[in-house]
Every structure is written in C-alpha cells, then in structure tokens.
C-alpha cells in the first residue's frame, strides 16, 4: 500500500470512507497497527497517563514526545504520524515553531495543538512554514484544570455555537485536520459537514470522518479499571493483539464503531 498522506485523508473524507487512527508510542506497536490497516498513528501526550502513570498529560515534555515519535517512526510502515505538542509547548510563536520543528525532525508528519479559536495564529504561522497542523477542540486534556475535569464539551447552545465558529476559523487559518473529543454527536456531525478538512472523533459520535482511541483503552487496559463511555474493548472475542487491532480498524471502516451507546447527547 502507498504511504498515507494528507491527500489520502482528504480523499477518504471526500469519498465517504472512514479514517482509522490509534495512539501509538513505540516501534513494535506501530508495526502491528500498520499491518492491521491503521491510517494514522497518534503519538499522544496521553503517554503521560498510560505509560508514565501521571494523573494528567501536563507533566509530559517535548523531549519525551520527540523520543516516542522517533520510536514510532522506526516501526512505521506507511501510516501518517501525528504527534501532540505537549502542555505549554506552543504558548508563544517561537515555541510553537521550534517545538514543532523538533517533532517533525523526530519523524512526525503533522503536529496536534489543543485549544480553541486562539489557535488560529499559531496554526497560521506553522502552516505557512510547512508544518501541517491538526486542531483539537472539545475536551482538551491539557486544560483539564480550567474545564473542571474530564467533561463533555458543547452541550450548551452558546458553547456549541462557539465550537462551530472555532472549527471554521481554524480551518481558515490553515488547519489540515480537526479532532473533536467528548462532543455531543449532533454537534460533531454539524462541524464535520461544515468544514472541508477531515474530522476525527473520540467520544464524538459516528458521523465524523474517522475515529481515534487510546491503544490501552481499546485493548481493555486501564489504570483506573473503568473505561470511558466512548471506549469499546476490542480484545473481547480476540485471541491476540493483532486480532484486536484488525477488529478495531474493520469496525471503524464499516461504521459499526462507535455505536450510539458510545456517544453523548446535547
């Protein structure tokens, strides 16, 4: 198969074909995910929680993100690698450019920034300099202390209206992809229709252009022992991790995941 690029993802959206994304932090899992047909490997700052055992993503550094990106690159077999810029790594224009360069040099094909409409300026700066950006809206874990916990975002009409406006503004600024986390399914569907760029969901219903899960969650592993509402354990009925990965990709591609039970209402 040819390598997955931004053009590939755009074509999948235009053709109505779903995009399968999964978090990945090492070479071995990267290879297995690629063999299962995962389109995008997300080197997420979620590693701070699932690998390092922190109670949030805030302690993760750019150096750690670059290290895991390089690990994933070595095992990658054609997927697009998307890497998170961690907490406060893009607080200024200079930080955004320097830290994005560090991650791209480590092997990322694209970087992800969490926030809202204020991301327009760093996205514009990065896009103009050849760095593809995915904007992350909705529940943004780096802002967990402001949000008051890990809660669904966009349930109030004012919030929903602002999120729709932010999505369109960030596309206009140059964002090449959008990720919506813990957003009411109806709102996510509206945003997906309103923008031309691919929209990936996690806890955002089935109408987005693709889905992403944290690898540990989809394998039934959790430090807390309780999976979020939007997670399905793909190890159930499977005898191997390879089987679970293939089942995840198939379920995303054929639209059977997520089901209505995995989404949120307004």
Curated annotation (Swiss-Prot):
Binding site for 3-methyl-2-oxobutanoate: 45-46, 84, 112
Primary localisation category: cytoplasm
A Gene Ontology term for the protein's cellular component: cytoplasm
Keyword rRNA-binding: no
Function description: Catalyzes the reversible reaction in which hydroxymethyl group from 5,10-methylenetetrahydrofolate is transferred onto alpha-ketoisovalerate to form ketopantoate.
Family of this protein: Belongs to the PanB family.
PANTHER family for the chain: 3-METHYL-2-OXOBUTANOATE HYDROXYMETHYLTRANSFERASE (PTHR20881:SF0)
Protein name from the UniProt record: 3-methyl-2-oxobutanoate hydroxymethyltransferase
Lineage: Bacteria, Pseudomonadati, Pseudomonadota, Gammaproteobacteria, Pseudomonadales
